[in-house]
A protein has these predicted regions:
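Membrane-anchoring hydrophobic helices of lipid-metabolizing enzymes
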Residues: 1-19, 24, 32
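A structural micro-motif
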Residues: 3, 43-45, 154
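Short acidic-hydrophobic, aromatic-tinged amphipathic segments that line or gate anion-handling sites
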Residues: 7, 69-73, 190-192
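Catalytic core of membrane glycerolipid acyltransferases/transacylases, capturing the structured
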Residues: 18-77
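A cross-family acyltransferase "interaction/gating" segment
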Residues: 51-66, 93-199
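Conserved phosphate-coordination/catalytic loops
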Residues: 75, 79, 137-138
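A Trp-anchored, charged/polar loop motif used as the substrate-binding/catalytic surface
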Residues: 78-90
Length: 227
């Protein structure tokens, strides 16, 4: 695909264990995050993935060889699914990291508008708070909170990236192939666990996502014109 990848600050990933909350924009960014955390930082990532990915034979086989959790997003037993997410973090060793994509799906403009409209109907105050989002989707807090609560001793890392936008469909990937040389940038922001409120994690996550959105905007502007 002619992809050039810059990981700005992998040093903040060490030491582990960690819980990582990552932006999700494409079919490729989860693979790149695994490469950054595994090959560069020397950590062992385990992912919360949607169960639909089990239809991919490679992900089904490899995904089950690793301690990942395939989330059933249509389950009637939400508490059971959240318990499975929390369990992914409960036995993290010093070089382990658990990863979730709080947006729950690959972000694009149409999804963002649709989700904000639905949020306006259910929770107007939160919708107004998250209305400034221009790059990310409103985060779904339940899974992220479960993952963090499963490892209450772990610092949390917010993972951002740019350059993968437009790769959320196979058509988008083909267009990037035609462009040839594409640069992607990934960065991490580590937050000490004592700085994370235990009683208002959902509100904290919204604030972190608003901050990440501004970071993504700034990095996207910086990336323009870079060849």
């Amino acid at each position: 695909m002619g992809l050039r990848i810059e990981v700005k600050n992998p040093d903040v990933l060490v030491p582990g264990p960690l819980v990582v909350l990552s932006r999700h924009a494409s079919l490729a960014d989860s693979l790149v995050s695994a490469w950054a955390m595994g090959n560069i930082a020397g950590l062992h990532p385990r992912y919360v993935l949607k169960r639909e990915l089990m239809l991919d034979p490679c992900l089904d086989i490899v995904g089950h060889r690793l301690p990942n959790y395939f989330l059933n997003r249509t389950s009637n037993n939400v508490q059971e699914e959240l318990a499975g997410v929390a369990a992914l973090s409960k036995d993290l060793g010093h070089s382990d990291v658990s990863v979730i994509f709080p947006e729950g799906t690959r972000a694009n403009a149409s999804k963002r508008q649709r989700l904000l409209e639905k949020l306006t109907e259910r929770n107007p105050e939160r919708a107004q708070l998250l209305a400034p989002l221009t790059m990310l989707l409103p985060p779904k807090p339940a899974g992220a909170i479960a993952l963090m609560q499963g490892a209450p001793q772990c610092d949390v890392v917010i993972a951002g990236h740019v350059g993968f936008d437009g790769l959320d469909t196979f058509g988008g990937m083909l267009r990037h192939l035609e462009q040839g040389n594409v640069k992607c940038v990934m960065w991490f922001r580590r937050i000490a666990r004592p700085d994370i409120p235990t009683e208002s994690m959902a509100a904290w996550l919204d604030q972190q996502w608003l901050l990440l959105d501004t970071e993504v905007q700034a990095q996207s502007e910086a990336l323009k014109g870079v060849k």
